Design a protein with these regions (language model features):
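PLP-dependent amino-acid enzyme catalytic core
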Residues: 1-502
C-alpha cells in the first residue's frame, strides 16, 4: 500500500484518494508517495499495447487504494475519442529527435493528458471516502491548465471549477478558449497580475483556515486541478513510460538502453513525471530542463540557489512565464530523503524542505544542501530567448517540414545546445506540449509570414501555409459567445471564489 505524505513533514499519511481530494497538505506542503513503485512490467513486453493499458498499469502502481475496475473506468472515460490522434500520444521523429506529441486532446495542450482523467479519479475518490460535500476546484493557469481543467470538470456533478488567469499573460486563442467555456459549474476570471500572482493567491486561499471553515459550513471543500494535486502528476508518468516502449518498438533503443528526456519547463510537474518514470525503472541518462527568459530553473540547476528576486519577462512561450516553480519542492524532498533511514527520512527531509520554502517566502531565495545539489546532477538545464525560439521553429519547419509551437521550440533549442556542448548522442524524447495553433501569431512570425489582424486570422493563415490540420477544439472558436468577462485585482481572488460559490 502506497501512502502520501507532505513534503514539509507533517506526520499524517493519506491514501491516494484522500490526497487527490485534498490537493494540498495541511502544512502547505505537496503530497508525495512514500515509495516510488517499480514498473509493473518489462517495457519490451508492452510493445504494441494501447496507451490506455499502460496508463492504467502505471496509475494502479501508485494509487493502490483504487480497484482495478475503478481505474479501468477512469482510463476508459479519459482516453477515448476526445483525443484525435491514433492511440492518444504519437511519437514522431524529426530533426534527430523523438517528439512526444501530448497535445491531441480537447484543448490542444499536454494538460489534457492528466486533466481528462483527474475528474474521474476525483469523483471515484469522493465516492469511496463518502465525501458528501461539494468540491470546488481552484485553478491558477498560465494558459493551458485552465482550459483543460474547465473542459474536464464542466458539468461534473458535485463539483464547481474556478479558474484564474493573467489577463495580459496568455495568447488570444488561450483566452478565448477559457472565456467561451460552457458548463453551469464553470467560473473564469482574468487577474491584473502574472501567473505567480494567480498561483500564490490560490495557495493562500487553500491555507486560509477561516475561509475554508466558512465554506465548510456551506457544505463545500476546496481542491486543486493544478499540478500541486498528485492526481494531476501521476497520470503524466504514464506517457514517458509509453514513449520508451514506442522507442523500443521502432528500433530506436534496445531494452535497457538509456534515453534523454527534454521538457519545456515552468511549474516543474511535467519533468518531475519523467523523473518518477525513471525511478520506476525507465532508463534515463539526462533530464534536460528547458526554460525561456524566465530562467529561474536554469540558474537553480546550475548553481543550487533558487531566487525569484529577478525581472519577470512576458515571452512568446507564456505557459513558462513562471518564477515560482511549485513542483520543484517534490524533487527536493525526494533528494533530501534519499539514503536516509526509513524511520527518520520523512521527518528530516520535511524539516529541510519546510525551511527552504520559508526562506523563499521571506527572502525570495534559498540554497540547497550539498547532498541535494549532488542529486541534481541527473538534470541538465538551459534556456532560449524569444529570437532563438522563433529561429528553432523556422529551422525545424524548413528543414524537416515539422511544425512546433513556441514551448516545444524552446525545448528543441535547449536540447540542440546541450548536444553541441556535450557531444551526447543518446536518443532523446522531447515533450511536445501544445499545438502550434494555440500560439499561431508567434509561430507565423517565426515563419516570416505577415502579421494578421487577430489570433484567429493567424490560425487560418498558418493552416493555409502548412496544411497541418487545426485541432477541432480550436476551429470556429472566434465565433463562440464569450460567457466569462470578469477581470479582478490580484488581491480579490478570495472574494471571487466566495461570490462564485453562492
Amino acid at each position: 500500500m502506497i501512502n502520501y505524505r507532505s513534503t514539509r513533514g507533517s506526520k499524517d499519511a493519506k491514501t491516494a484518494a484522500q490526497a487527490v481530494i485534498k490537493g494540498l497538505a495541511e502544512d502547505k506542503g505537496l503530497f508525495v508517495p512514500d515509495a516510488i513503485p517499480a514498473l509493473p512490467f518489462k517495457p519490451e513486453d508492452m510493445v504494441g499495447r494501447p496507451y490506455k493499458e499502460i496508463a492504467k498499469a502505471i496509475i494502479a502502481a501508485f494509487f493502490t487504494d483504487y480497484t482495478d475496475e475503478e481505474l479501468q473506468a477512469c482510463v476508459d472515460g479519459a482516453y477515448d475519442s476526445k483525443f484525435e490522434a491514433e492511440d492518444v500520444v504519437p511519437v514522431v521523429k524529426a530533426g534527430g529527435a523523438y517528439f512526444l506529441e501530448l497535445y491531441h486532446g480537447r484543448t490542444a495542450a499536454f494538460k489534457d493528458m492528466a486533466l481528462s482523467i483527474l475528474p474521474y479519479l476525483l469523483t471515484t475518490a469522493m465516492k469511496n471516502e463518502n465525501e458528501e460535500k461539494k468540491v470546488a476546484i481552484l485553478t491558477a493557469t498560465s494558459g493551458d491548465t485552465g482550459k483543460a481543467a474547465l473542459e474536464g470538470f464542466a458539468d461534473v456533478p458535485g463539483t464547481e471549477i474556478i479558474v484564474f488567469f493573467p489577463e495580459d499573460g496568455v495568447s488570444e486563442v488561450q483566452k478565448r478558449q477559457m472565456t467561451t467555456q460552457e458548463g453551469a459549474n464553470t467560473h473564469v476570471f482574468g487577474i491584473h497580475g502574472n501567473f505567480d500572482d494567480a498561483q500564490t493567491g490560490v495557495k493562500n486561499i487553500f491555507n486560509d483556515d477561516a475561509f475554508n471553515a466558512a465554506l465548510n459550513e456551506r457544505g463545500i471543500r476546496l481542491s486543486s486541478a493544478n499540478s500541486i494535486n498528485i492526481g494531476r502528476l501521476i497520470p503524466q508518468v504514464a506517457y514517458y513510460v509509453y514513449a520508451y516502449i514506442k522507442l523500443i518498438e521502432n528500433g530506436a533503443v534496445k531494452p535497457g538502453e538509456k534515453i534523454n528526456i527534454t521538457v519545456p519547463t515552468g511549474n516543474f510537474g511535467n519533468i518531475l513525471a519523467a523523473y518518477y518514470a525513471s525511478k520506476m525503472g525507465i532508463p534515463v541518462n539526462k533530464f534536460i530542463c528547458a526554460s525561456n527568459e524566465n530562467k529561474v530553473l536554469t540558474d537553480f540547476l546550475t548553481t543550487g540557489t533558487y531566487s525569484t528576486d529577478r525581472e519577470f519577462h512576458i515571452t512568446n512561450s507564456p505557459s513558462m512565464d513562471i518564477l515560482i516553480s511549485s513542483n520543484l519542492e517534490r524533487l527536493l524532498y525526494h533528494l533530501s530523503a534519499a539514503g536516509l533511514d526509513e524511520s527518520s527520512a520523512h521527518e528530516t527531509a520535511g524539516a529541510e524542505i519546510a525551511a527552504l520554502m520559508k526562506s523563499l517566502d521571506q527572502n525570495k531565495s534559498y540554497t540547497v544542501s550539498d547532498k541535494v545539489k549532488a542529486g541534481l546532477a541527473d538534470f541538465a538545464a538551459g534556456y532560449a530567448d524569444q529570437a532563438q525560439t522563433e529561429a528553432a521553429i523556422a529551422e525545424m519547419y524548413n528543414d524537416n517540414n515539422y511544425l512546433m509551437d513556441t514551448h516545444t521550440a524552446v525545448a528543441y533549442k535547449v536540447y540542440e545546445d546541450y548536444k553541441k556542448a556535450t557531444g551526447d548522442e543518446t536518443p532523446v524524447v522531447i515533450a511536445s506540449t501544445a499545438s502550434a495553433y494555440k500560439f499561431a501569431a508567434s509561430v507565423n512570425e517565426a515563419l516570416g509570414m505577415p502579421a494578421e489582424a487577430d489570433g484567429f486570422a493567424c490560425v487560418r493563415a498558418l493552416n493555409a501555409k502548412t496544411g497541418v490540420p487545426v485541432p477541432s477544439g480550436l476551429k470556429d472558436l472566434d465565433k463562440k459567445p464569450v460567457r466569462h468577462t470578469g477581470v479582478i485585482e490580484k488581491t480579490q481572488l478570495a472574494d471571487a471564489v466566495m461570490e462564485s460559490l453562492k
